[in-house]
Amino acid sequence: MALGNKIDNSSNRVYCLLGDGELEEGQVWEAAMCASHYKLDNLLAIVDFNSLQIDGNITDVMNPTPIDEKFKAFGWNVLTVDGHDIDALLDCYEEAKNFKGAPTVIIARTIKGKGVSFMENQAGWHGAAPNKEQVELALKEIEEAL
């Protein structure tokens, strides 16, 4: 999509959200190399970097780190941010929009389940649904944090 927009001289931007566990897949790096080769500065990838995937910690499954250095080696503009800081994320979006000549990746360091005591940093919640009582507790904890 980003390449098509570039060819069509479109001002549209493409946003791609990735999980850190996804970065263990080869096709992600093929796409990263292609995006850099074609200087797709209309492409912004955001990596949700919480170090957890369905099978556990990413470094125990198939360690994709250091993510920032890998993207730099592939020719990307790399920004790192606290993924829970909305103002900092918005600043990164603006910086990415103004960066020319290469795609940008924002590595958003996050905590899986942040703000919910029984979910925080727990890989088991990756593909699980809370029951009714857990939903009520989670909503209560989130509302209290606001």
Q: What is each model feature region?
A:
Residues 1-146:
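Glycine-rich ThDP/TPP pyrophosphate-binding loop and its adjacent helix/strand module
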